[in-house]
Amino acid sequence: MVRRLARGCWSAFWDYETPKVIVVRNRRLGFVHRMVQLLILLYFVWYVFIVQKSYQDSETGPESSIITKVKGITMSEDKVWDVEEYVKPPEGGSVVSIITRIEVTPSQTLGTCPESMRVHSSTCHSDDDCIAGQLDMQGNGIRTGHCVPYYHGDSKTCEVSAWCPVEDGTSDNHFLGKMAPNFTILIKNSIHYPKFKFSKGNIASQKSDYLKHCTFDQDSDPYCPIFRLGFIVEKAGENFTELAHKGGVIGVIINWNCDLDLSESECNPKYSFRRLDPKYDPASSGYNFRFAKYYKINGTTTTRTLIKAYGIRIDVIVHGQAGKFSLIPTIINLATALTSIGVGSFLCDWILLTFMNKNKLYSHKKFDKVRTPKHPSSRWPVTLALVLGQIPPPPSHYSQDQPPSPPSGEGPTLGEGAELPLAVQSPRPCSISALTEQVVDTLGQHMGQRPPVPEPSQQDSTSTDPKGLAQL
C-alpha cells in the first residue's frame, strides 16, 4: 500500500500541467470575473501607483542636524531667572529642558544628620535598629549606627554621613511657569538624502534679520521655526499649568516627505506635536532632575545648594521619506499588477467548479489527461498521413472480398497498368470536401465503424507528383 502510494506520488510529481482555454457563456460568472479584475486594477492604479507612488525609488530616514536656542525671562516670588539658569543643557541640541518649578535645599555641607523619612526602613527606635556602615542605594549616605531625632516632630531616623541637611520634601519651592508660555524656541534643522544628493533646511534664505521679527505660522511663515512654548504645549493638547507643575516630555516631530520628481519648493517640513511620557501612569509620568551649585564659605567650607527641577523637556524628532521615479520599481509593480489580474480567473474557476459544476460537466471540459505512447510509431503523424492518403485502415477492417496478400516471393509481377496494393497505393487527387470526408471516416474507424475501401486512382500521377502534395 505504501509502495503503491509512493509510486503514485512519484509519477504525479513529473506530470506537466498546462492551461486549457474554455469559453463559458454565463453572464453572472462573467460579471464576477470582470468586477474582480476591475477592483484589482483600481487598487493598483489608485493606491499602489498614485497613493504609495510605487513607481519611485525611495529613501527613508534622512541625515539630520538639529540646533535649538531658547529665549525669555521669568521670575519667581523673589528672583528673576534668565536663560542661563532655567535651560539645561545650555548649548542646545535635539533635546532641551526648560525648568518651570524647583525645590531648593540650601547650604548643604558634608557632615552627619538624620536620614530622610522618605527612605525605606530609615525610621528607628534605638541604635540597635541602625547598622553602622550600611549603605542604602535609595538613601542619601552611609549609616553611622546611631538613632537620632528627626528634623521636626517626635520621630527618629538613622543617622547618616552625607550632605546635610538631606532633601526631605520640605525644601523651598519656586514656581517659574508664570511667564514660561512666552518663552521662544528656535529649532534649526537641515536634512540630507544621500541617495538622491538632496539637501534642504527649515529656514528660508532671506535677509539676515528675518528671524528677529517672525514666529512660526504654517500659512504665513512656514520657514520661520521660532515657536512659543505655550503654542507647543497647546498643540500637544496639554494644560500648561499642570504640565509646568509636574513636568513632562513634549515631542516636536518634523516630517520631511519629499517628491523629488517635483520642484524643490514642493519639499517642505511638516510639524506636529505630542506628549511622549505616559500622562496617566503615576509611576512614570512627569519629568524632573537634580543639579547642585557649589561655593565656599570663608574660603574653607565647601557648601552647595541642591536643586530638584521640574520642567518641560522638548525632544525634536526628525523623520521623512524621499522618492524619485525609477524604471526598475515601475516594471516590477506593473508586472505584479498584470499578474494579480489573474486572481479573477482563479476565483471564477473556483466558483465554476464548486457551485456551478452540475453533473461534473465543467470538470470533464476543464481537465484532460494526455498520455505519451510508450512505443512511438516511426510512421508519419496520423493527420498528415491521412491527408496524403498514406495510412491504411486497420487489418480487421479489410473487405472480405479482398484477396490476402501473397506470401513473400510468390506475389504477381506488377506490370504496366496493374493496380498497387492499398498500403502502397499512390495518392489520388482530392478536394477539400473529400479530405473532410476522409477525416470523418477515419474518426468513424476509431468508433468501430467499417470504413469504405478507397478506390484506385483514376489517373496515375505518380510520375509527376509521387506523394500527391500538389493536390493539397
Curated annotation (Swiss-Prot):
It is found in: Cell membrane. Glycans are attached at N182, N239, N298. Residues 53-326 are extracellular. One of its GO terms (molecular function) is cobalt ion binding. Its main location: membrane. Pfam families: P2X_receptor (PF00864). Residues 393-472 are annotated as: Disordered. Fast activation by external ATP. Exhibits slow desensitization during prolonged ATP activation. Not sensitive to the ATP agonist:alpha/beta-methylene-ATP. GO terms for biological process: behavioral response to pain; calcium ion transmembrane transport; chemical synaptic transmission; detection of hypoxic conditions in blood by carotid body chemoreceptor signaling; neuromuscular junction development; neuromuscular synaptic transmission; neuronal action potential; peristalsis. The keyword Kinase does not apply. Residues 309-322 are annotated as: Pore-forming motif. Belongs to the P2X receptor family. This is P2X purinoceptor 2. It comes from Rattus norvegicus.
